[in-house]
Structures are given as structure tokens and as C-alpha cells.
Amino acid sequence: MWKRWCDYKEEILRILILGASGTVGSALYKCLSDQYDVYGTYNKNKPDDVCTWNVYKYDIADFLVLESILNDVKPDLIISSLTGNFEHQLNVHRHIAEYLKESLGRCIFLSTANVFDGSPDSSHTEVDTPYPISQYGKYKYSCEQLLLDYLDNRLLIVRLPRTLSSKDAIIEVQQVENGQPVYANLYKSYNTAVNVAKAIQFCIEANRYGIVHLTSNDIISASEFMELLLSHYEKNLTYAKDFFTTESYCHALGCDDPALVRNSDDGNFYLTLSSINTDLVTNFGISCKSIIHSL
């Protein structure tokens, strides 16, 4: 029988983070390392402030390397925060699902608000049925289904909105300075990598499985969020503001058929998450303004 997280008291839980050099992956590594035996992978950029012997260079196309890492680490829990080629990633998740099914280990899969990008008519909670039309959203939803089929209640799916570090926020400002338009009728929810990492640690300690949305308490238009960012960084500039149509929204997602988009009645597009998990909202709910002030 599989162990609950809290059963690992005498023996420290061994965690493997796939994608430990990314925004959320690196925050997870730093957050979890004090309490657990944490290992990570990276592709090009080795994570800062980590133990040299606990990270592995890994190209997701190389399955022999993945098998070697799994045999070396023998993880009780795998947290997937991978990026890269969708087909390769899907194969990686099939491989780790097979490994964890046999070892009775557990998995936390970091998913996205884009599993709902075909229905920008409202915000979506954990009980809503995904409807992706972008390749990215379709891939993430395929991974969710694959892992669920293999692991059932040994899987936690964590769906994330736009999740920022200080570096990410600065890049967004620079893109606007370089002329990238900001959409006034595109609404998003947000979070910070540090807050997400703390919430995931809470989920580990609470033996959580199923689906959770780790998101801000409020939603805000992309242009309003940019105004707050510019004010935070004391930038006084006029930027290009645009408005999505169904056609341009569909095109931005790489979809050729606007008829697939489920439109809202108010002309806005909501790529947002909400949560019905009151304990997570109570402990880790954060406003968009607080997100910016924490960067």
C-alpha cells in the first residue's frame, strides 16, 4: 500500500523536481530543501544555490538519462515542472507514471490555466471541465489525463495562472517598453513562484491529491496589471494598448477556427482560475497588488 506524505517521518521523503531551474521549479527546490531530501534536473541553466550533487543535467529527449536518474534517486515523490517539446514531455510523463505506478510513489504535476483557454467566458474552478484549444493547453490536459489514469489518488494536479518571479516581472516591463501591446480586455489571475512553492509544501504535508488551483484572490485585466507593475518599478511610459476580438484571441492561441471559442457576453476574455478549496484560499490567497509588492 502506498504511503501518505506524513508516513515519512523516520525516513526523509525523497523528492525529484523535474525542471528545477525554471521559475516555479527553482522556488520549489529552495522551499522544500530544508525539510526534505530534494533532487532536481535542469537542461541548460543550472539552478542557483543548490547542492552540486543533488542536480542532474537532463535533456527530455534522452530517456536513458531519465531512467538513470530515477534509479539513482529512487524518488518517493516526483514534481513535474518541465518545459520543452510537447511530444517529448508527454513521453517523459508516461515514463514517470509507469515508474511511480510500480514503485507506489506519488506525483505532483504543474498544469496551467490554458486547459480552459477555449472557454474564456468566465473564470474556472477545480470542478469545471477543461476545454483547451491551444496546443499548449491540449498538451497539458493530455498529461493530466495520462497521469490520472496511471496514478489515480497518488496524483496532485496543480493548475497555475501566470506565475511570476521578480525576474519575470522585469522582463514583462521590458517587453512593453519595446512596443509589445497589452490587451485591455484580457483578464488574468496571477501568483508568485514563492507563494506557489509554499502552497505546494502545504499540500504535501496535508496529503493532498486531486486537483487544486493556486491563484490570486482577484482577477485583473492585463493592462491594469501592467499599470501596477509600471508604478511599482517607477516607470513613466505610454504603452501600446490593444483589444482582443474572437479572431485575434484565437489566432494568438495558434488556433485556426474562431468558432471554437466560447465567448463571454461582455466582450472580455477571461484566462483566469478560481478555487473552491477554502483552506488554500485562506492560507495562500493573495491579491494582485500584493503579488506586485512582493516582487
Language-model regions: role of each:
Residues 2-4, 264-295:
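Amphipathic terminal alpha-helices
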Residues 13-35:
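N-terminal Rossmann NAD(P)H-binding glycine-rich loop of SDR-like oxidoreductase domains
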Residues 40-47, 60:
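N-terminal Rossmann-fold cofactor-binding loop
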Residues 57-74:
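Conserved Rossmann-fold cofactor-binding substructure of NAD(P)-dependent oxidoreductases
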Residues 71, 76-108:
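NAD(P)-cofactor binding segment of oxidoreductase domains
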Residues 115-158, 165:
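Catalytic helix-loop patch of NAD(P)-dependent Rossmann-fold dehydrogenases
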Residues 145-195:
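NAD(P)-dependent short-chain dehydrogenase/reductase
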Residues 199-250, 284-295:
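Mid/C-terminal beta-alpha module of Rossmann-like enzyme folds, strongest
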